[in-house]
Amino acid sequence: MPKIKTRRSAAKRFSVTGSGKFRRRKQNLRHILTKKSAKRKMNLGQSAIVDATNEKAVRRMMPYA
């Protein structure tokens, strides 16, 4: 049986934590930053954990993660 290919788009966006959860970046920190407060931009810079409802889909895209 052939190997399953990893979706490269998902591999570039997610990384696996030590406990097996997926880490992701937050959105809204690319442009139009002047109207956003410093506190909001600082919080957007931190990484987040993929929600449980989406974790199954991410795991399917990255079979060897």
Swiss-Prot record:
User: Organism's domain of life?
Assistant: Bacteria
Cellular component annotations (GO), alphabetically ordered: cytosolic large ribosomal subunit
Q: Name one Pfam family in it.
A: Ribosomal_L35p
Any idea which UniProt keywords this protein has? Answer: Ribonucleoprotein, Ribosomal protein
**Segments of skewed composition (Basic residues):** 1-11
Family (UniProt): Belongs to the bacterial ribosomal protein bL35 family.
- NCBIfam families in alphabetical order: rpmI_bact
Name the record gives this protein: Large ribosomal subunit protein bL35
Q: Which organism is it from?
A: Nitratidesulfovibrio vulgaris (strain ATCC 29579 / DSM 644 / CCUG 34227 / NCIMB 8303 / VKM B-1760 / Hildenborough) (Desulfovibrio vulgaris)
What gene makes this protein?
Answer: rpmI
